[in-house]
Amino acid sequence: MLWRGSKKKEVNGFVFDIGVSSMQLDNPDRGFSFQKEGSLDMRMDSKGKTAAELIENIQENELADLIYNYGDERNSRRIAKKIVEYRKNNKINTTLELATIVKSCFPSKYYKKHPATKTFQAIRIYLNNEIEELCAGLNNASQYLSKGGRLCIVSFHSIEDRLIKNFFQFGKDNLDLERNLFYKYRNKVIKPNNKEIEINPRSRSAKLRFAIRNEREFSSIKLTELGFELV
């Protein structure tokens, strides 16, 4: 997010709805969905390596760390091992191929979420540098928020929610109050109710957090300062 606007450079509020969109999920050619056959791409744009290229070349331990750190997937070691074993004799080129491999690492009983959900999220987040981009977006928004301005973030993944929470609280817990940017912060996350989920099932994982900007001078907050040491 780069500023284009008046010389005052102040905004009363920002709303971030982060992550992949329904249009991207519903297009099998983008490779984001584990429920539709498509090329294993997962890139937000056409730059950089695809998910298929990443999976083909990454070391098993690195893949396990990636799935665990970016997806909070407890079975990451088993999944990584299964993927590496499969790719010895086969290329993994499609979304359903990867989803089937991941699914085979779980018991036959099914859960509320598809077994491949966290693995797909982890690969997508890593591939598109989404955590780094989110941190940059939070910093940019905080820089241009006016005193009393609201910053509202809707996230869909625990690692994103943790980053947002740590950003809003930064300076309060470590007593570096001069760098704390928000004087009012709703600590309790807001989630969709049953009626909202019935209307839009994809909202079931949504979490809304918001905070109100104080008068302190902006100072950029690094990802490592928020407790993130990612692969």
Enumerate the language-model features and the residues they cover:
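S-adenosyl-L-methionine-dependent methyltransferase catalytic core, i.e., the SAM/SAH-binding region
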Residues: 1-231
